[in-house]
Amino acid sequence: MIKVFIIILFFIFNSCSTFKKEPTKCPKLIAPKKAAEIIVYSENKTPVYLGIRGVQKFCFKDGDDIKMDLSVNIRAIRNDATEDDYVPVNISIVSVDSNEKEFDRDEFNYSQFLLKGSKIVDRATTFELKVPAGGQVLLGIK
């Protein structure tokens, strides 16, 4: 009975070991003006401004590369808020090496709900990306 108990404890403690992530300085993040703010049309054919309104980033060593966890806040602004609507949002994030060659990419497409009476709607979306040493990250919406 004691042997069984010790074996169970061994498996519990062995499976609880964790690997500590080593934080590191995040690489340069660029959002070109033409890709950071755009006008799109909703399902009801009304113009909606979309813009990047904040980015939180956390970076960790991942071998020779850097793992970047991002939270990107997209703000939608419309003038006509008399009815519920949806607006298409496409977010792309790309890491490039020092020669500007694509290294990794993450994209997310969704329809953002705009509640009747709400002129401004924010939504945060999370991403995970690998960045090579000496590389940078490009962020844009379309």
Descriptions of predicted regions:
Residues 67-73, 90, 138:
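One-face residue pattern on beta-strands with alternating periodicity enriched for small/polar residues
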Residues 106-135:
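Short, solvent-exposed, Trp/other aromatic-anchored flexible loops in extracytoplasmic proteins
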Residues 25-63:
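Transition segment at domain starts
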Residues 46-49, 56-69, 78-85, 130:
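Short, solvent-exposed beta-strand/turn "edge" segments of beta-rich domains on protein surfaces
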Residues 17-20:
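Bacterial signal peptide processing site
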Residues 87-100, 141:
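Extended low-complexity, serine/threonine- and proline-enriched intrinsically disordered segments
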Residues 12-15:
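C-terminal motif of bacterial Sec signal peptides marking the signal peptidase cleavage site
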Residues 1-8:
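Sec-dependent signal peptide recognition
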